[in-house]
A protein has these predicted regions:
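Short, intrinsically disordered terminal tails adjacent to the first/last structured region
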Residues: 1-8, 474-475, 513, 521, ...
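Aromatic- and Gly/Pro-rich donor/ligand-binding loops
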Residues: 412
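Preference for solvent-exposed, low-hydrophobicity sequence contexts
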Residues: 526-556, 562-569
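Intrinsically disordered, low-complexity terminal tails and inter-domain linkers enriched
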Residues: 509-533
Length: 569
């Protein structure tokens, strides 16, 4: 009779399960993608049967059949193997399962939405060919999306790790698509109105087709955003990833869109007032897109600012810092362009119209970015004590100072190169000011930014150091005293920050230091208080600068004080 051999289970912390999950989930991901590509190809041929796009495409048909008939069964078998393993809680809590579902959910959502919306826009535009392939791609990937959403929401086998990431990814993608489509639709509508005002003819498709095509993308994106943000509860998520997405997309992206749109509108208005060298229709060309970007961006920004108000203080600070950074970048750009233009005008009083246009662009950037930075950063208001100790503010100050300093150093090198090139070049290629005005403008802007933020960083450090409690130089202090020890205990604790233990002298009655009872029966209270104050001041001076784990302090006889540093226990 042979004994059965027992195969030992993998030891705790073994890399075998991790490697196995990496291989299995990577292979499953690839097989699902291959199968979806094959199915979409076959469905596209079915929808586009009889068209020129699919007629005679033998290679495409062979590829689709191979991907579907070979990759499909392999993907199904591997998925069934993985699905049975997910009865184990360890498998459900693994990073591989969570990352696979998140990655496939994101890929299928993006591909399905892009395919369906592209087909819808093509149909609105009156295209007879091409939309079939987009629709087939969108429908197949929509099925993949529904399948993985079912697994993600499964009551027993849903991932335990990063379960909320698909919600955040879906909401972010929907917001981006919705904002892009809305801006494009509104821009086309405004451009049509502006062209009608300027009586300029437009070529191409009718304006309403462009508006409806962009509106289809906008409505589709808003629907995706609503489904994940409202229906799936994305707005209630308070995880770190959700907060990062809120700040980066909802705040930073919206602020960039708003600042760019408002700045462009102001630039167009300034050109209409002071720089009409070009035709009015050409000057007004970017106005529609700028108004649309500013309007939609401000709405998105205002909404997400309201949402961020209910988040943690760290999220609020991050939203403030990214907004301040955008305003700072716009203001610095305006300063640099302004210096560049001013130097050009000073060197060549009869400068061309291009310099005037450049100057108006700098004024627009400064007029938008400056107030935004001032209202957000509030340089005239001292920061809250709780804000000084936060890592985000320190990182922001160091990052702005470091980046500005790096750009300033590079700009100095460029200026030096231009100066030596001017001195050594025999052929005149313009004045020295013309050669150096662009890097000089950049140097002034980055120098101001670096200098200011370095000064703020130094000031914050001094405030933090002043508010930081003194480091305890003594852990424990033993006070040997006669009489009332309370004044001495208070002084010792204030000077050293240590815990104080009082030992009463046994020879209090015979020492020169009168005990409290003797003082009350014989000496006057005024003399006793003066003696106590003098002894307290003497003790404070004696303990100043003493550093030891334990300190023994012996007072008496009389005004004698002896401080003895001791070693650790």
């Amino acid at each position: 009779m042979t004994a059965a051999q027992t195969v030992p289970a993998p030891a705790a912390g073994s890399a075998q399960p991790t490697v196995r999950r990496l291989i299995v989930y990577t292979l499953l991901f690839a097989l699902v993608v291959v199968t979806a590509v094959g199915l979409s190809g076959l469905l596209g041929r079915l929808l586009g049967a009889g068209t020129v796009l699919v007629a005679g495409d033998v290679a495409g048909l062979a590829r689709s059949l191979a991907f579907t008939l070979i990759g499909g069964p392999m993907a199904a078998a591997l998925w069934w193997f993985v699905w049975r393993l997910l009865d184990d809680a360890v498998e459900r809590s693994s990073a591989g399962w969570g990352l696979y579902l998140t990655g496939m959910y994101a890929v299928s959502l993006i591909t399905a939405a892009t395919g369906v919306l592209s087909a819808l826009a093509a149909v609105i535009g009156g295209e007879r060919l091409g939309w079939q392939l987009s629709l087939s791609n969108g429908l197949v990937w929509a099925g993949v999306l529904a399948w993985h959403r079912w697994m993600w929401r499964h009551p027993r086998k849903s991932p335990s790790l990063i379960p909320d990431v698909p919600t955040v990814v879906g909401a972010a993608f929907g917001l981006i698509i919705g904002v892009g489509g809305s801006v494009t639709a509104l821009a086309n509508l405004l451009d049509t109105a502006i062209q009608g005002f300027t009586a300029s003819a437009s070529l191409g498709d009718p304006w309403w087709k462009l508006v409806l095509q962009a509106l289809a993308w906008g409505v589709g994106g808003v629907a995706i955003w609503w489904w994940h943000w409202i229906h799936d509860g994305g707005r209630r998520l308070t995880t770190d990833f959700a907060d990062v997405a809120l700040v980066v997309i909802g705040i930073l992206g919206a602020v960039l869109l708003t600042v760019g749109g408002v700045g462009t509108v102001l630039f167009v208005l300034l050109r209409l007032a002071f720089d009409r060298t070009d035709p009015v229709s050409e000057i007004l060309e970017p106005l529609g897109a700028a108004i649309a970007a500013g309007a939609v961006g401000s709405l998105v920004w205002a909404y997400h600012r309201t949402v961020s108000a209910g988040r943690s203080s760290t999220t609020l600070q991050a939203a403030k810092l990214v907004t301040s950074g955008v305003g700072l970048a716009a203001a610095a750009t305006g300063i640099g362009i302004g210096v560049n233009s001013a130097l050009s005008i000073a060197a060549t009083p009869l400068a061309g119209d291009g310099i005037r246009t450049l100057l108006l662009g700098g004024i627009s950037a400064l007029a938008v970015g400056g107030p935004l930075w001032w209202l957000t950063w509030k340089p005239g208001v001292p920061p809250e004590p709780t804000e000084l100790g936060r890592r985000g503010r320190r990182v922001y100050l160091i990052a702005v100072f470091g980046l500005s300093a790096i750009v300033a150093v590079i700009t100095l090198l460029v200026i030096g190169y231009r100066v030596f090139e001017f001195l050594l070049d025999d052929v005149s290629g313009g004045s020295l000011v013309d050669r150096t005005r662009a890097p000089l403008g950049l140097l002034v802007a980055t120098g101001l930014a670096a200098g200011y933020h370095f000064a703020v960083w130094r000031h914050d450090r001094s405030l933090t150091a002043a508010a930081t409690p003194r480091k305890r130089m003594v852990r424990k202090l033993i006070l040997v005293a006669a009489g009332d020890p309370e004044p001495l205990v208070k002084v010792a604790a204030e000077v050293t920050g240590a815990s104080v233990t009082v030992w009463k002298r046994a020879d209090a009655g015979t020492s020169g230091t009168a005990p409290s009872g003797a003082a009350s029966s014989g000496a006057s209270s005024g003399t006793a208080e003066e003696a106590a104050d003098g002894l307290s001041g003497q003790l404070a001076r004696a303990l100043e600068g003493v550093a030891a784990d334990r300190v023994l302090v012996i007072t008496g006889p009389g005004s004698r004080i002896e401080v003895i540093p001791l070693g650790s226990d």
